[in-house]
């Protein structure tokens, strides 16, 4: 099990990107949260098996139909918070 702390850049706010991230998290069976940042980027904390996180991260990089993801930074960690679900934080 790993944790990814991700920051997505580009047109990722006001386009349903957080909902898309939540759907992808459910599809890849990862837990954590997603939230908008004041700087226009989106922050994601995701935990799960390594292969699931890799597939999830690839989906985030591709983005939703209405988003335009220009970059995603990922910090990997073994310090898990123990999330059981994935939620949108406001």
Swiss-Prot record:
Domain of life: Bacteria
Molecular function, one GO term: acylphosphatase activity
PROSITE patterns named in the record: ACYLPHOSPHATASE_2, ACYLPHOSPHATASE_3
Domain Acylphosphatase-like: from-to ranges: 3-90
Catalytic activity annotation: an acyl phosphate + H2O = a carboxylate + phosphate + H(+)
Record-annotated active site: 18, 36
EC number: 3.6.1.7
Pfam families per the UniProt record, alphabetical: Acylphosphatase
Top EC group: hydrolase
Key words, A-Z: Hydrolase
Gene3D superfamilies per the UniProt record, alphabetical: 3.30.70.100
InterPro entries listed in its UniProt record: Acylphosphatase, Acylphosphatase-like_dom, Acylphosphatase-like_dom_sf, Acylphosphatase_CS
Cited PANTHER family: ACYLPHOSPHATASE
Family affiliation: Belongs to the acylphosphatase family.
Name recorded for this polypeptide: Acylphosphatase
